[in-house]
Regions:
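FAD-site-proximal beta/loop scaffold in flavoenzymes
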Residues: 275-308, 394, 406-484
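Glycine-rich dinucleotide-binding loop and its adjacent helix/turn
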Residues: 124-142, 203-214, 264-330, 452-470
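Feature captures the FAD/FMN-dependent oxidoreductase FAD-binding
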Residues: 80, 142, 147-151, 199-269, ...
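Ferredoxin-type iron-sulfur electron-transfer modules in oxidoreductases and energy-metabolism complexes
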Residues: 23-42, 64-97, 101, 112-142, ...
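Conserved hydrophobic helix-helix packing surfaces used for dimerization/oligomerization
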Residues: 148-150, 171, 311, 474
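Beta1-alpha1 glycine-rich phosphate/pyrophosphate-binding loop at the start
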Residues: 5-32, 44, 63-75, 83-85, ...
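A conserved FAD-binding loop/helix module that cradles the flavin
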Residues: 320-325, 330, 480-511
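Glycine-rich Rossmann-fold phosphate-binding loop(s) that bind the pyrophosphate
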Residues: 151-155, 315-317, 479
Length: 521
């Protein structure tokens, strides 16, 4: 422990964002450059905890060695801190930018004071590692002669690929989009995660021996989902290749399904006027925008433009905030965010004790931007969408009603508050209401069993820790197995699945995985 009294001497400070009114003029990353001296001071706030809950079940899902690298940063030993960080996290430059940081919610210091700024420190470590040239390709010295196919190039698929390649297996990753990265590339906008950051890591994996195949759908042409965001990304070049998953299984020694949860949940499906033009899924909006940005700096007019439009985003969370931020950068006339739940408390409620994730009021980057631009927080809480209204088939407004929850935590049914009806002007509506599971055509072709772990959600049946499906040699990891979740959980799943595959192929494994502590391979 570098400074035993650091948590008493120093207050929490975080890396600043660029000015809201400046950053909405571009899609550059919102983070400013960190002050490394300040970060060393922040690392000193890490306490000598008897039990570091930041690494517990309620903390970091990949068991990052947070106290260790905080201590090393305080001592100025950045390269050693990077080695500790990479032991448990293949992609700290992703989690350091987009993770909500459950580790900070479980920080022991958080009981009496603001938590250690773990996420900022993590991001600074890996960014310095790249800038100093410490992070270089390390291909395996020998190959095992075994081959693994991974379907999906999101964080789960990439983490599995990194681990399996590192141990010497030949890995091929299939992606139906035109760029590798899955959610990291097209689901998270550039101002939160610059795509050069994603491509930098993908190129590193390629240099280490991972093979990437894009524009390839694992399934039949007739089963390709109509109107899906990936079809949008391929319809212009007409270069999509189709591969039979059963043949893929025969061609490789093992197969990992890491396809994500891409079937959107639409709570407005039965609302009058749902068929009106102008209502889109959040992923359609964000994906089209990022592709247009990368292809042409938005000059090809291939995206959904919010310029001069009244925009309503239905659903909170990160995706809802990203729709707000993207709409502001387009130059929308107004933006409102409907949230069905009540406004959270400013501080933890008695029913939400530490070290559980704190359900409190937060202002995300996009909320701050909307307030700076339009003068008010864009969120309308306890608001239920009742109907869409329009003219000549085109959306013109949204009817809502306020709801009353019988319990503040929202676990009991709500009642509508009569007399609270309102008509909101709307030219565009984006549905940021989550996902119900993976597309089922490829699992069906492989004969995989499905399960319903959470209500309407349906995922590929594969036990956590084993990741084996109903078909020998076929594994599942990430959101397609777990259900929609965080990038850090996807990395957890990818690392765990990699170890399971390695054990299947070799009879044993020396690969580390969450919950299994060993030196980096």
């Amino acid at each position: 422990m570098g400074k035993p009294t650091g948590f008493q001497e120093f207050s929490r400070q975080t890396v600043a964002y660029r000015d809201p009114l400046t950053r909405i003029d571009d899609f550059d990353e919102i983070l400013t450059a960190p002050d490394e001296d300040r970060l060393q001071t922040q690392a000193a706030r890490c306490m000598d905890c008897g039990v570091p809950f930041c690494q517990s079940d309620t903390g970091c899902p990949i068991n990052n060695l947070i106290p260790e690298w905080n201590d090393l940063i305080y001592d100025g030993r950045w390269q050693e801190a990077l080695e500790r960080l990479h032991r448990t996290n293949n992609f700290p430059e992703f989690t350091g930018r987009v993770c909500p940081a459950p580790c900070e919610g479980a920080c022991v210091l958080g009981i009496i004071a603001p938590a250690v700024s773990i996420k900022n420190i993590e991001n600074a470590i890996v960014d310095r590692g790249f800038s100093e040239g410490w992070i270089v390709a390390q291909p395996p010295a020998t190959r095992t002669g075994k081959s693994v196919a991974i379907v999906g190039s999101g964080p789960a698929g990439l983490a599995a690929a990194a681990q399996l390649n590192k141990i010497g297996h030949q890995v091929t990753v299939y992606e139906r989009a035109d760029r590798i990265g899955g959610l990291l590339m097209y689901g998270i906008p550039n101002m939160k995660l610059d795509k050069q950051t994603v491509e930098r890591r993908v190129n590193l994996l390629r240099d280490e021996g991972v093979t990437f195949v894009t524009r390839t759908h694992i399934g039949k042409p007739e089963d390709f989902p109509q109107g899906h965001v990936n079809q949008i990304m391929t319809e212009r070049d007409q270069r999509l290749t189709f591969l039979d998953p059963t043949q893929l299984r025969k061609d490789f020694d093992a197969l990992i399904m890491a396809t994500g949860a891409t079937r959107p949940f639409d709570p407005t499906a039965r609302c009058p006027g749902r068929e009106l033009s102008g209502i889109h899924s959040a992923m359609d909006f964000l994906t089209r925008n990022t592709k247009s940005l990368l292809d042409s700096q938005l000059t090809d007019n291939a995206g959904i433009s919010a310029k001069d439009k009244h925009v309503i985003v239905i659903g909170g969370g990160d995706t809802g905030a990203d729709c707000i931020g993207t709409s502001l950068r387009h130059g929308c006339r107004s933006v409102v965010n409907f949230e069905l739940m009540n406004r959270p408390p400013v501080e933890r409620a008695a029913s939400n004790p530490w070290p559980a994730w704190p359900t409190i009021q937060r202002t995300d980057y996009a909320h701050a931007e909307a307030e700076a631009k339009h003068g008010a927080d864009p969120r309308a809480y306890a608001t239920l969408t009742k109907a869409f209204v329009g003219e000549s088939g085109r959306l013109a407004g949204v009817k809502t009603i306020k709801v009353d929850w019988s319990k503040p935590d929202g676990r009991a049914p709500f009642t509508e508050i009569h007399g609270s009806e309102k008509l909101w002007p709307a030219d565009l509506v984006f549905l940021a209401t989550g996902f119900v599971g993976p597309e089922k055509t490829t699992p069906d072709l492989l004969g995989l069993n499905m399960q319903n772990p959470r209500g309407n959600w349906e995922t590929i049946a594969a036990e956590h820790g084993a990741f084996t499906t109903s078909e020998p040699g076929v594994f599942a990891a990430g959101d397609c197995r777990r259900g929609q979740s965080l990038v850090v959980w996807a990395i957890n799943e990818g690392r765990g699945a990699a170890r399971a595959v390695d054990e299947y192929l070799m009879g044993y494994s020396t690969l580390p995985a969450p919950g299994i502590t060993m030196a980096s391979v």
